[in-house]
């Protein structure tokens, strides 16, 4: 953009290198090194001894031309020595082995021996000389400390940061010549003294710092040199011209026109590029302007500055704006139409690209085009379009209206079908409330072009019956986004309004939406080329309806098209201020940025380490830190707030970005150019063009990107790919540990390749864009579809040799995906490719669609709906609260005015849009029995999808697990108002057995619909969890092998899942890390979760709170295995089937409620797999048997006990009950629970650790298969027990356990018992049958199946199986076997007809038994106590002992099974030892 100065040779062209070696005594260099910083000189060469003499060594030139005496020494083996003392220079030379490389230059008028002279010269920032000056200062500060006359600031240490001296002392130093450079900055004197010839004994050896500068933290040096480099030098001067040495030529990039040696030698200065600029306004840098132009000084309060790449820009401190245009040349600049052929207007650049041909860059307005701007201007002038548009603009503005009847023009109606490329037209406008949205361009071959009814300039009036006059640009784009591919949209347009012209008001905002192409943000400096007629500034609606700004077109077909060039690169964002949330991570040295005071608050002054504050930009104003408003805090208070966070803490930062920026000379890096800032344009005005950001786009940052990058960014617009997916390119640089991710898949020709685990602290995690379960499409441009796993690894190995890789991955997206706000404004990473702008796609709620719904409930019921609240802050105008479920038969259902997905904007006339979750709950509670909701109808779909219908069930099935029901204690998004707000659950839960029996079958049918993948993305919500110390905190049930879907089985208390608050027991898992779960196995689901590393992304469909049992799907298949990565600690032992919240409102007796619960539970368990075992709060003890054949009569429900006060008593005594929802509402054995909680649950089982893994399963009795299957037993040999094992493969392997393994486990169980764990005991019936109870501690052996006889009236909802003995059994005398008898085993005859029954364990009684060594004296008491409890429970359940038939005896084939050592068998007496 700038004119080239008169080019002369730079001193760099005279630099020469040679390799020399010494011959002589060790330490004798054979050459004389003179000068040094202590003398104010560069190091330079003296006499070279090329002949032996005087006892010294000789200098032998190995290669290159021998240097001459007096040559300035710049480098030794690539290490800069300028600014070092003579002593340190010699130390550096002696450090290297011979031969050594010397880089020297002949002294001239710029570089000579005088160090002070060189430091006093003014050089363009980013130039070689400027960098060399910084190298000199850094080397000086190894031995000297700058001095200043200002007072010390907070944290500064005198003698370390500065020597703080008086003005008189400073003057004395200056007059004595002791200062190498001096000047003033901010009214204070600064100077750099000469270093001492000999360092003090306390100073470290600087050689290592000089040699390995990149390994040392130079930030402190940078802070110290900032003021020195910014100061106004008292002796500053311009480099003198000489015949063989010339000034630098500015060509727009800050590089010098030199010989070939330039590129070879300039890299050595790159490592110390400073992070600050010249800012003093008196430094006009006149030496870089053409002398013959005789330009006058800059206008008042104007300043010229340079980008990091050397481009000149100008700062107008009057308006706090920046511009590329030199205000002094504005008057001399020609209008484009006045330029000659071959001449370009000022500020334009012509780019010759080998792939895309010739195009033009307007550096003033930050835009590109293919047409020559001179030819374009002349054509416009001939047609007179500029005047026409200018005249019509005022008319257009004056006639804006929101009333369609007042529009002037012809109404046009069109119906367009959305294709994979969108609707085929671009829109512009809508940046202000009084601006029309108009069609800017109709794309060739698109749906709009094929329809033929839409033309450029048409005003969009109506979309699908919704008037959009006055709507914002973003509003309309979102409406188009919500239209699925292949669906039609009806448009009403008005023809008769011209498009706005370039010559409009220069301060108008151009496009107020971040351009997005296929979900990826297209920011300033990026280019998207296409073969279509894309026009600048237009919003292209792609297949997802996202808007993408195309920054170049390949041809311009007419006057109207060519005039549509006003939207520019810089207009990718609004000039209006915007609030952005940035996630910070506190590193070992802080958050990686510095702040300073500003009129609007604490401003980000400098980015010190971007890895901890990715997305943060210089100039951002801090508004909130971790949701705490800090706008009114002082600088020190904000610093203290930041200091209080520990290392590693994630701290969200709310910042204000955009708007009028404060004056700055900071040459923004490429990262800074990615911020969303507006561009203010002018064409015809003769005043300088203001821009709210410092321009930094040169040839490399303008549309001339790498051709492959341009192609990859643009090809996705029309690429044939599945809907609801997006492709992105991720460029990674290899670290020592590799690229930081694993690859899955490729096992077959049709299997895709997926990204596996993201390695912590690896390259992929630091980059932040790659996700587990992303489908890998290409590696360095090579498609991997159909390739084997090994071939993919070979490609990655090749990429690793190159040190970098470009990955193309495909990611599935879905409605309502909650994306972190921080990524919507992520800056470029160090790899140079942008992060995704994964903006949320909310449904817009038009105010005219709102209506009121009044709900009135009875005293004994709730309102019957569930509210979902978005955790992340929604976009402006989007209501974050919506209906998540409507309970069947509830007031919400009866009124007919609420449906799933409707948004709630107000409660009783009070707006809740900005209210917190808890406040909304309280507001509804305070409403009493009547509440009025202001509802905004859902726009995404009409009526709930089939998956959501599963939520509409009887209130009897709607109870939530304890710990999740009380709305004001839920830690997440969802509050359940179905029964929690003033609800009396008694009437809701009073159902007869027959009523409940009829409910079970429809329940199963509805859940079957949930299992099918019907429109999965609708009605679902995404949840992303981070692994906690003990896992994700949930467990699954189901899978393809069980002929059912995947469901949430339980939530661990205090685990990540329950803390998130959106996950509930019974929710169906639709996707795991982007992969659909339809048809996948249980094992595959676990692998997907494990592949995600520390994070997992789940797509969930709301459930009913009940878990569909595998018996309801396939009674011959097991279905549950533990994927509970975080075992939950127990709640209070007095838990009940209904939630705590609901029980607090039960006015009826507990007996009535408990009887209903018993009936419910019995029916729920009726059709389940036969092998249900007793559960101890999800940690089922294993019954130590190898092979026992159990049969179950599905006709006869099992017996059970009631749940009145006696049931609660049993809970208090540690008797564990099993709840269907497997949530934290089960009582537990305290001792065993504490034991389990201390053991982390592994994700995969090592074969060597299988026994230990089993011990960790919360329901081992259910998870273990039979060890031996006997023919003729009535059991299906292929049938597996239901289990919830932490190992995905455990179910298939348990059946093969050998006897030796069992013995080992038994011995281990025995050793654990010796350590003091509660003991197991066996209750042996008179006929040889045993009744076994197991401590939760002993989890080492699989439990066999069981014969169960059911009776409906005796099924308990709390106890899985408590098979009580008959009168005959209970009256039999028995005794408790002592410890010494534990090793005894039963005979085959004793066990041949045995039916093992369970009784629950009382932790208190177990502990008492463990303490009492003599069990014989207590046997009768224990037996009597249990019998009494049993009888009372039976009475409570409404049955008598006479009604309890004897257990049906199934023939058992004798087998070589062993009784665990914990179980005491007493010979042949037939007496049962009860476990107490």
UniProtKB/Swiss-Prot annotation:
Cellular component GO terms, alphabetical: bicellular tight junction; cell-cell junction; nucleus; plasma membrane
Biased composition (Pro residues): 193-204
Naturally occurring in which organism (per UniProt): Mus musculus
Subunit: Interacts with ADRB1, ADGRB1, LPAR2/EDG4, GRIN2B, PTEN, and PTPRB. Interacts with unidentified tyrosine phosphorylated proteins. Interacts with FZD4, FZD7, TGFA and VANGL2. Interacts with DLL1. Interacts with PRRG4 (via cytoplasmic domain).
Binding site for ATP: 123-130
Main localization of the protein described in the UniProt heading: membrane
Region Disordered, residue ranges: 184-266, 551-575, 664-691, 818-844, 939-966, 1109-1151, 1168-1476
Topology within the bilayer: Peripheral membrane protein
Primary gene name: Magi3
Biased composition (Acidic residues): 238-247
UniProt region (Interaction with LPAR2 and GRIN2B), positions on chain: 852-939
Purpose: Acts as a scaffolding protein at cell-cell junctions, thereby regulating various cellular and signaling processes. Cooperates with PTEN to modulate the kinase activity of AKT1. Its interaction with PTPRB and tyrosine phosphorylated proteins suggests that it may link receptor tyrosine phosphatase with its substrates at the plasma membrane. In polarized epithelial cells, involved in efficient trafficking of TGFA to the cell surface. Regulates the ability of LPAR2 to activate ERK and RhoA pathways. Regulates the JNK signaling cascade via its interaction with FZD4 and VANGL2.
Lineage: superkingdom: Eukaryota
Family: Belongs to the MAGUK family.
Compositional bias annotation for Polar residues: 559-575, 946-956, 1114-1123, 1285-1304, 1363-1373
Annotated protein name in UniProt: Membrane-associated guanylate kinase, WW and PDZ domain-containing protein 3
Region (Interaction with ADGRB1) location: 729-811
Keywords, alphabetical: ATP-binding, Cell junction, Cell membrane, Membrane, Nucleotide-binding, Nucleus, Phosphoprotein, Repeat, Tight junction
Cited PROSITE patterns: GUANYLATE_KINASE_1, GUANYLATE_KINASE_2, PDZ, WW_DOMAIN_1, WW_DOMAIN_2
Domain WW, chain residue ranges per copy: 296-329, 342-375
Residue ranges of every copy of the Guanylate kinase-like domain listed in the record: 116-290
